[in-house]
Amino acid sequence: MATLNVCGLKRRSQYPDFIEYFDKYDLICFVETKLEDTDVVSIPGFQCFSQPRKQKYIRKSGGIALYAKNDIFEHCKHLSTDSDYIMWISIDKSSTSMDENLIIGVTYVPPSQSRFFNDEELQTLENEITSMCSSHKYVYITGDLNARTANLIDYVQLDEFLAEEFELDDETVHFF
């Protein structure tokens, strides 16, 4: 399985190297696909589950997709969700070596300062994850949670010692 924040799947899929790279995987999860309900992005040998962002805006944003190889896709089922931040897929145990179905949650949580971030939506996501984990034996969460670090910063701070040691110019120092 591979997971990637693509920041626009349609645009990325135009590059043959991008598509060819994923041939070695059975499942590919993409977040920030920026797809709408009517968009179709084909990857040869795969079929797609897609969940566009429910909240629309002027330009496309968000969105989640899972591509499964054709022979696995028939064993996959899209599960309903109340959250815009996660897409749930169940993979039947008959196609794995597990004794129960595998539940995959593909997530994209917008940055906390984004206009699309919503505390209630985050709470819904947390509740759904808790519910899935309590009702299923195998739950796998993947995606982009945008560094939810509690009270810690979610960005890199400038190290003054390194700035002096490498004699960084003012423009670089002020970037951080």
Residue ranges and their predicted role:
Residues 1-176:
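A shared catalytic/ligand-binding motif for oxyanion handling
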